[in-house]
């Protein structure tokens, strides 16, 4: 899931809710998809951090030899 796509959907949802004063965003489906969206971002960031850490460890290991 791409972040920009995800946040655009959320912004569109909030905008639609304000425009028509209909609780689209607070519906179960949308809140679940938003949760999944935030979760995917969290996983992406944590994966990137661990990947960078592994790379730095890898390089330092071979430089010390």
Curated annotation (Swiss-Prot):
Main localisation: host cell
Organism encoding this protein: Acidianus filamentous virus 2 (isolate Italy/Pozzuoli)
Keyword annotations from UniProtKB, A to Z: Host membrane, Membrane, Transmembrane, Transmembrane helix
Stretches that traverse the bilayer: 21-43
Localisation per UniProt entry: Host membrane
Membrane topology per record: Single-pass membrane protein
A Gene Ontology term for the protein's cellular component: membrane
Name of the protein in question: Uncharacterized protein ORF65
Extracellular face of the membrane: 44-65
Cytoplasmic side: 1-20
């Amino acid at each position: 899931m791409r972040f920009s796509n995800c946040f655009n959907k959320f912004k569109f949802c909030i905008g639609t809710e304000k425009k028509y004063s209909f609780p689209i965003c607070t519906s179960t489906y949308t809140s679940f998809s938003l949760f999944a969206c935030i979760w995917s971002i969290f996983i992406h960031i944590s994966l990137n951090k661990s990947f960078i850490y592994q790379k730095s460890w890898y390089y330092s290991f071979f430089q010390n030899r």
